[in-house]
């Protein structure tokens, strides 16, 4: 990443550009990579081993915490005093990403075509910084973002999307104060609902063709492929 780098918790010097916030997992790479499935197995393993649960109970509690808090780790920290960095080592950092994620020239071209004079590309993820950096490095796009707002597992209180404070944190770190200048894409309906509720009207829900769309739209824009951003937000891209 260039410019402000991680910027976690630190507000950079403000500029007048809009900011385009990109989610990472199942957004910058497709769900067909099944990284979420790999992660779910590792999370269930962690619940089973560290909480002494049966596999069925581990899966149920994992899903409950994910639904209640947006991240399984938040439930573990709140209710079981788990060390989130140790959890990260056993789950996120243990994923075989090098065997799954490869450079994506089409994605790189899309990001290169952003009008950087008017738009600042920024990563916005519920993952820890280690995972975020691994993914964008393997995709071959680490030089195309100016910073990342992530869930800081080392912080006293875990903060993640769709908590409104997480959107406030992203704006602070990206150096922007006007919600009308925030563009955002995520594959999570809950996160898109949270973004729109926070005032990010230019929020886009990415729903791949093989995924089930929500019965009620999560926000004003829904696409099935990142390339569709060129059509719904032509102002974001450089003129031909």
Predicted regions and their residues:
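Short, flexible active-site loop motifs that bind/organize anionic cofactors or intermediates
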Residues: 48, 77, 97, 122, ...
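Asp-based, Mg2+/Mn2+-dependent phosphohydrolase catalytic module
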Residues: 1-17, 112-115, 119, 128-240
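A generic secondary-structure micro-motif detector
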Residues: 33, 62-63, 100, 122-125, ...
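N-terminal helical cap/lid subdomain that shapes the substrate entry/recognition surface
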Residues: 2-4, 8-22, 27-108, 116, ...
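Generic enzyme active-site microenvironment
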Residues: 21-23, 124, 184-185
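Electropositive, surface-exposed helix/loop patches at the edges of structured domains
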Residues: 95-98, 120-123, 186
């Amino acid at each position: 990443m260039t410019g402000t780098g991680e910027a976690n918790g630190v507000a950079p010097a403000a500029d007048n550009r809009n900011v385009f916030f990109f989610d990472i997992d199942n957004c910058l790479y497709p769900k067909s990579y099944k990284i979420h499935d790999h992660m779910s197995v590792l999370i269930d393993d962690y619940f089973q081993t560290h909480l002494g649960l049966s596999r069925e109970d581990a899966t149920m509690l994992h899903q409950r915490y994910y639904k209640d808090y947006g991240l399984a780790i938040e439930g573990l920290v709140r209710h079981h005093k788990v060390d989130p960095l140790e959890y990260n080592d056993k789950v996120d950092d243990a994923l075989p990403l090098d065997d799954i994620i490869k450079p994506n020239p089409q994605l790189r071209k899309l990001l290169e075509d952003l009008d950087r004079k008017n738009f600042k590309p920024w990563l916005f993820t519920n993952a820890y910084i280690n995972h975020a950096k691994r993914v964008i490095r393997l995709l071959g796009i680490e030089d195309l973002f100016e910073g990342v707002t992530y869930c800081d597992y080392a912080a006293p209180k875990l903060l993640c999307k769709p908590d409104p404070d997480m959107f406030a944190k992203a704006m602070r770190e990206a150096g922007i104060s006007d919600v009308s200048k925030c563009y955002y894409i995520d594959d999570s309906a809950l996160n898109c609902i949270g973004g729109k509720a926070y005032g990010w009207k230019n929020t886009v829900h990415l729903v791949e063709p093989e995924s089930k769309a929500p019965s009620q739209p999560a926000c004003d824009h829904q696409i099935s492929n990142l390339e569709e951003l060129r059509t719904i937000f032509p102002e974001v891209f450089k003129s031909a």
